[in-house]
Amino acid sequence: MCIRDRSIRAIISAPPGPVVPDGYDPARRAYFQQIGGYGFAIGAPESIEVKTTTISECYRRGLVRFRYGLASRIRAKSPEQTAGLQAALLTGVRSYIPQEQTDALRVAGLAHVLAISGLHMGLLAGGSYFMATLLLAMIAPLSRRYDVRKPAAIIGALAATGYLLLSGASVATQRAYIMAIIVFLAVILDRRAFSMRSVAVAALITLMFHPEALISVGFQMSFAAVAALVVVYREWHDKRGYVPRIGFRQKSWSWLSTLTVTSFVAGTATSGFAVLHFHRVANYSLLGNLFAMPIFTFLVMPAALAALIALPFGLEAIPLAVMGWGLSLLLKVSVWVATWPGAILHVWAAPAWIIGLLGLAFLLATLGQGLRRYLGFGLAALCFMIWSQTPRPDMRISDAGQVAFWDNKDEAILYVGRKRSDRYGREQFMQKAGLVNGEIKRYQDELAQCDKLACRFEVRGKQVSVVHHPSEVPLECDTADIVILTKRQAGPVARRGCAAKLLDERVFRTAGAHDVYIEDGAIELRPANKKGRRERPWS
């Protein structure tokens, strides 16, 4: 017996499905995380003895407790403004970051700072490697007889392993860790460290343990960035050949140009996948990274490494203060960039299959040579052309029969039945349409003709009836194009005799919420819980 589990009275329900078609699916994520349900407690927890706990479970829970305890210690010793960010960068616990800081970093194109990935792993493990190399090189008898880079690579690998465990081992962190280990192995074996073969091995190992990560935004963006950087810098290195010794001014210019190229290449490689998943573009991302990355690279992460080294000795206060000062500068940069006009552009969602086509285009552009590379760029351009012609949904019908639709004349106005209901689903619908700042009004106040039994209004030339009682369904079916019954089922007779599109409790229970597209007089209903999803084990 290594731990005490706890018993608690709670109300638990199955993980919910997507609230919009092709939207984020919490049930799928919960399935692969082995989470059977979500809920909330209705009583105080009680400790119980559990004798069936495995060694691996003991280790996992102990590590979680250690991480959260360390996060609390770091927050207590850090400046108040940046304490949450410092805990997130050192332990992966992001729940203490204020929302306004997250929003500012996202708008400035610096959200990647929050996710522990290749940048963080490279700086921390690489910093450990170079520091170990320097210290070992100072030992003259050792450096004269042996290649000190190899034991330094082992130290770097150990530092990377410790950071992986400490940070929570997300998929992006695992990818970065695998790449770091491959690089250190290459140093030990006197091989080329950075190559597309290394990227492919890292991808295969990641997918071997987490095959579900293939369609996740973290996997796609992290591998897109590292693959593009490897290709660009490998070709740059091969073409420039011998580089003569240069002075400080030339070195400064070379460093600035390298930082610019790195930010541009990584940003360009990941932009398509980021927009596909998040439906927004940070217009000043390149400038934000040019201003912020020197602070993060040369101040924040070295101080973070020093803080981790000093933690066992209780000497972390000074490194954490330096780290906090650097992060405060970075936050000032992000807030400054976020206030520029047009800093964020919201775009509407693309069809789900576009991401597969864009992935193929990216592979051709990075792995191909000559004509195949140009074919990849052309295919990417085709993806964006198709995307630009994709229609927005005209109306949303939640799984409880709540309706939201755009004004026929002004798409900046969204009409709803009740402002307080279906908030999350409505936000996802607005984000999918690329109109997150739309004004919300009640259709009962302006457009609809309502009585005790139903509300009737027009959307893009089609008559819609929101019915509150099954007895009214036959009458509304004769005059409306879409009939929505908010309570109970319509019954088999009414369903067969209805010429309109009829949605009732039976449809909502099976197919969930719906997006409605009206194009050239035709009505298309797209359910959130599609037939293909209903056949999945997490449905």
Q: Which stretches of residues belong to each language-model region?
A:
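Membrane-interface helix/helix-cap signal primarily in integral membrane proteins
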Residues: 4-112, 488-501, 505-538
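Membrane-interface segments at or immediately adjacent to transmembrane helices
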Residues: 7-9, 389-456
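Divalent metal-coordination and catalytic microenvironments
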Residues: 10, 89, 117, 168, ...
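Hydrophobic alpha-helical transmembrane segments in multi-pass membrane proteins
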Residues: 39, 93, 97-285, 347-392
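Short acidic-glycine loop/turn motifs at beta-strand connectors
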Residues: 43, 407-412, 460, 519-520
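Membrane-interface amphipathic/re-entrant loop segments adjacent to transmembrane helices
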Residues: 47-61, 107, 272-291, 295, ...
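Short amphipathic alpha-helical coupling elements at transmembrane boundaries
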Residues: 72, 88-91, 103, 183-187, ...
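Cytosolic C-terminal regulatory domains/tails of membrane transporters and channels
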Residues: 430-539
